[in-house]
Amino acid sequence: MYRWLTKVLGTILRLCERPAPGARALLKRRRSSSSLFSTAVDTDEIPAKRPRLDCFIHQVKNSLYNAASLFGFPFQLTTKPMVSSACNGTRNVAPSGEVFSNSPSCELTTSGSCSSMLKLGNKSPNGISDYPKIRVTVARDQPRRVLPSFGFTLKSEGYNRRPSGRRHSKSNPESSLPWKPQEQGVTEMISEEGGKGARRPHCTVEEGVQKDEREKYLKLLERLKEGAHGSTFPPAVSHHSSQRTQMDTLKTKGWMEEQNHGVRTTHLVPKQYRVVETRGPLCSVRSEKRYSKGKADTEKVVGLRFEKDGTRGHQLEPDLSEEVSARLRLGSGSNGLLRRKISVLEAKEKNFPSKEKDRRTEDLFELTEDMEKEISNALGHGPPDEILSSAFKLRITRGDIQTLKNYHWLNDEVINFYMNLLVERSKKQGYPALHALSTFFYPKLKSGGYQAVKRWTKGVNLFDQELVLVPIHRKVHWSLVVMDLRKKCLKYLDSMGQKGHRICEILLQYLQDESKTKRNTDLNLLEWTHYSMKPHEIPQQLNGSDCGMFTCKYADYISRDKPITFTQHQMPLFRKKMVWEILHQQLL
């Protein structure tokens, strides 16, 4: 001990006796603690301290460490190590307040997206220090994301926003929920046509997507409804003069996807309800097949129940509610309940007349290879402004067609074009006289009153028609109103089970004004009724992206005076059929 003290004092005296140098190197300026992990590069290159003083400091520290080790005292280094950042390559100096213990490794956590590693070996840059190795890992967490709403969400996001600059659904009110950080990346091979060579890894993001998507979408609609009643909730849609797009809402920024030559790189981030850009949630074709395969048999049978309900009124309402609940719980282990219900329904199906079975076979349509190839080309890569079909004073671009991809939201152009195809078909014998109003009709009527849409029916007498279809768009959701002039009633059909009494009242008042203008007579409003279809009376969507498809298929079945018997699992086929129908301007 005394020898050690003598050695230290001797070193100090020798240094004090030496003359001070004429010019000393400038010291590096200290950085504040706030800039410890700054990505900015310090451009001031200042020479380091002179080696002699640096040598002395390290000798003192080394001596103190040896003394502490001799007496068994814990020793802490209060040095200012140089930290090399892995994300930007700059050197950052830790503040003097940072304390690093002599444990084998230490971990510091800060906010950000990169990691910094600090390794102090037995030798310092000057070759003197031999204190233990210290490893400091600075892991920066993923930043919390706030997304735009379908987010889905999907996705996210947000969901690759709508091509060709149509009316967009911008943000999801649920986007304020934080993301859970997850550091995992998966490169996945996907076949556009459902090839066999690829296997999907087990992804946390996709667990329960189909299970929760409908509930999340319903919450979004409730939030939007509250905003419509006078709250300060910001509008989720920006309007364009030509069309409206909805994909932004369910896609997530964290769900980045590339579909080049069948390869998709997905950064797995837990899919919370943030309507994200929600590039929101786009699932692959294989995911869709896996989802639909598990539900196909059940939904076919449920379709029978929907169909049977049309002939028996409200008798089956309790059973149907249970069946819909069972479908929504499909991913949560209710297989036993479903098997029991399926067996009961299959037994009842045997009693259906052959006419009912023939009606169901209408939906079992298979596309030929040539049709599949043509559809794939239309949905494939190409200029988004390329016009693929033109009719009814409407032009359908490749960007519009691509809204018919699975889990994408339909825009105005596609829906208006399809409604015109239904009107053209109704001119054939055996179909009811039909007229379809534009998707922009109701927003214009609601904002400007009858005078704003007075000329929209120029040359058309609505009262000569049997059915009038009115597609309704409310921020991020599509629904349909059917005016049945034969029965003097208005029906509101919503794939999310919402009610539309106020919408029907506005349209009924429009009919009153139209009758005064075109026929100079008043309607007897006491003879007219309006009704919102209940969830057990019409098929309901099980995700957050098919509301536009359900609206089109409601119109298709009603325009043929057919019971609505389709189900959710048929949507992928219906999307492909609609692509072909728009390209060839005729319905299959």
Curated annotation (Swiss-Prot):
SUPFAM superfamilies: Cysteine proteinases (SSF54001)
Posttranslational mods: Polyubiquitinated; which leads to proteasomal degradation.
Keyword hit for Metal-binding: no
Recorded coiled-coil stretches: none
Region (Protease): 394-558
Main localization category: nucleus
Entry GO MF terms: deSUMOylase activity; protein domain specific binding; SUMO-specific endopeptidase activity
Top-level taxon of the source organism: Eukaryota
Protein's name according to its UniProt entry: Sentrin-specific protease 2
